[in-house]
Regions:
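Catalytic cores and adjacent flexible loops of soluble metabolic enzymes
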Residues: 1-224
């Protein structure tokens, strides 16, 4: 298939232009260790999975495209590394099979509610699935968002998503199919800052008048 890209006019040329080689993964690994960051990646085949083994990662991820490949996800589960399983483009049966494989292998996992369109329209996000998946499988459920703004990811966290995954970019106008579904720096800062404040914003189940409300009540309720 012919296509125009900064790296050439074929799919293969674009793939080669975008993919990291081993040296670049080594740099990611080195930098992440220096910054005390636990990095990980999504393998899309067994060879790539074996390549990632050398880094002794503590987490791994199954992309939405791979959730129906039972042979592959069995290989992932056998590694006994905590795995984030994206559920885009899948039906309940697909998710059920993946969960069964991981539980049979006694491999811990987090389901990631996701909708695989780029960017995803707000009307298609269906964030209620975060609650439904958590109730059905009694496991942690996160959110892998592809919308253009930070708001829905904040709502996902408020619904109890245990983790948030987002694509990030320096500039959404840059070339690439994922750019329009990514957050720029300011959007990422808003997302992170607000999610960290959520426990304070949501609060607790306390009811009654706050002490700091009393002076206002005295001022406004003249009949007291």
């Amino acid at each position: 298939e012919k296509r125009e890209s900064p790296w050439g006019t074929t799919q293969l040329e674009q793939k080669k232009g975008l993919e990291f080689d081993e040296k670049e993964y080594d740099l990611i690994d080195k930098f992440s260790k220096e910054q005390n960051i636990e990095w990980f990646a999504s393998a899309w085949d067994v060879k790539s999975l074996e390549f990632l083994d050398k880094y002794k990662l503590k987490n791994q991820k199954i992309a939405s495209a791979m959730i129906t490949n039972e042979e592959f996800i069995s290989e992932v589960a056998k590694r006994k590394i905590h795995t984030y399983i994206s559920t885009g483009m899948s039906n309940p049966e697909n998710i059920e099979k993946a969960v069964r494989i991981f539980r049979n292998e006694k491999c811990s996992f987090t389901l990631m509610h996701s909708v695989s369109t780029y960017p995803t329209k707000e009307k298609d996000l269906n964030l209620i699935n975060i609650i439904k998946l958590r109730e059905k499988y009694q496991t942690e459920v996160g959110y892998s968002g592809h919308e253009a703004a930070p708001g829905p990811s904040i709502f996902a966290a408020a619904l109890g998503a245990s983790c948030i995954e987002r694509h990030i970019t320096l500039d959404r106008s840059m070339y690439g199919s994922d750019q329009s579904a990514s957050l720029e720096r300011q959007g990422l800062l808003i997302l992170v800052d607000t999610v960290r404040k959520l426990p304070i914003i949501i609060g607790n189940e306390r009811t009654g008048i706050y002490e700091f409300e009393l002076p206002i009540a005295d001022k406004l309720r003249y009949w007291q």
